[in-house]
Amino acid sequence: MTTKKMLVTCALPYANGSLHIGHMLEHIQADIWVRYQRMQGNCVYFICADDAHGTAIMLKSQQLNIAPEQMIAQIRQEHQRDCYKFGISYDNYYSTHSDETRELLHDIYSRLNTRGFIKSKFISQLYDSKKNMFLPDRFVKGICPKCKKDDQYGDNCAACGTIYTSLELINPKSVISGTSPIIRKSEHLFFDLPAFTDTLRTWIRSGSIQKEVANKVEEWFKLGLKKWDISRDAPYFGFKIPNSSEKYFYVWMDAPVGYMGTFKNLCKKNKNISFNDFWGSNSKTDLYHFIGKDIIYFHCLFWPAVLSGSQFRKPTNIFVHGHVTLNGSKISKSKGTCINVSTYLSCLNPDYLRYYYATKLSSHANDIDLNLSDFITRVNSDIINKILNLASRNSGFIHQYYNGHLSNTLTHPLIYNMFIESRHYIGKLFQKREFNYAMREIMKLADEANRYIDKHAPWHIAKKIDRRQEALSIYSMGIQLFRVLMIYLKPVLPKLANYSECFLNTRLTWGSLSAPLSNHRINKFKIIFSRIHPDQIASMTNKSQLHERLTDNNV
């Protein structure tokens, strides 16, 4: 099997607050896929970083009365810790506020400027005369000029997806002061996105993005691409534009370059990795971006055009997912439907949410509802009752009478062969990111394994001393089948997989599926994963609501 070299990224969390469980969907989705790729023997570098620039960060740090550099450093540490505790296997978690990103950004800007893709012109902008600052798109809200939906930001409508400028908003208001902004002129720099229309059409039609996402992008082509404003006026927290007085790069110019900067930093740590092998225009490696559907425009149009114009490679694929709702409602701090990652981790096992998201995730950009009642039922039924019960019910006898030694013979090889033959289909589902179908297939096998034990009832056979060897072979088969199931679940449940490797006294590898454990001793099974009780969920939601009230009062 040919080993592939891959670079996989997640969209960069914004460094102005804590991660919530909705944010974790993307990190979990990408991590499952990365872990599966590594099990197949592929060389994968998995990276992420905090998106650490912009007006929002500048204002938040002022509100907290600390330097923005201090604030983003603290938040990065928190984000990194949350991802680590959720088992997200990043090779590097960095920040866009870095020397590597700044140097690469300047290089890209210079290349684009030299090749004639940077234009300048005076533009009219909304200006908050109370705060003495130009208002970025995300600090203006008003009525969408197309669908007339109220409370929409100044760059695109969350309701209908229309892209527009803040000047097109109906009845705009400053998010900062609540006042109606005035219009002022300023000279800005623009990236000539329309010049890449044909290049982008070819790239998108090559299968680099999902079909439904490509259809959405085609709508933007029909409307005609517009030059992209890549500059912002002071005051601003970010990288200054070279040879430009009091002008800064717009956060969406340096944020995707943060992928490159983060990888460059990884190359400094590991001298065996070549930056150009992964980002050079003639790269033979694969580059994958996992993103949410709200940032399609930036990643599927602006970013590949910037890469093409600056003579770097374009992504192999961009995988788009939907949003997370909680009990059918949008995740919202003000409405008390926001559960921070740290709060979740104080109450529940991270593998449980990883599994639940896996049962919902597909290759499409559909929204996913985290229904907490269904969450309890699914975790208790599948992980506890089906998977862990299989290990628990079969290991006791083996230790009691045979000191943990498994039978050396497969009494019923047909069921074992059926289990390992499923690796081809389950592997294809993992590869295609159809995790929901993969979990369904794995749980079907778990049901078969438990039915096998129920059918042969080794506890009855074991009552007769002369038939204990026969009982051992049945119990041993239960352990063999548990091992196969845990190999399939290893990308999804890293914490449980680590425990299972200790219990089984062997590594869980895809390549070892065909060979059952022979002449092998297992360790005693210990209950470290327990059922979810409704009071744990109640405690988690209560803690979340209390945290939001305290945060609102203190900041």
UniProtKB/Swiss-Prot annotation:
UniProt keyword list: Aminoacyl-tRNA synthetase, ATP-binding, Cytoplasm, Ligase, Metal-binding, Nucleotide-binding, Protein biosynthesis, Zinc
Gene Ontology CC: one annotated term: cytosol
Sequence similarity: Belongs to the class-I aminoacyl-tRNA synthetase family. MetG type 1 subfamily.
Protein name in the entry: Methionine--tRNA ligase
NCBIfam families in the cross-refs: metG, PRK00133.1
PROSITE patterns referenced in this protein's UniProt entry, alphabetically: AA_TRNA_LIGASE_I
Subcellular locations according to the entry: Cytoplasm
Motif 'HIGH' region: where in chain: 13-23
Subunit structure: Monomer.
Role: Is required not only for elongation of protein synthesis but also for the initiation of all mRNA translation through initiator tRNA(fMet) aminoacylation.
GO biological process annotation, one example: methionyl-tRNA aminoacylation
InterPro entries linked to this entry: aa-tRNA-synth_I_CS, Anticodon_Met, Met-tRNA_ligase_1, Met-tRNA_synth, Methionyl/Leucyl_tRNA_Synth, MetRS_core, MetRS_Zn, Rossmann-like_a/b/a_fold
Provenance organism: Blochmanniella pennsylvanica (strain BPEN)
EC numbers on record: 6.1.1.10
Gene expressing this chain: metG
Annotated PANTHER family: METHIONINE--TRNA LIGASE (PTHR45765), METHIONINE--TRNA LIGASE, CYTOPLASMIC (PTHR45765:SF1)
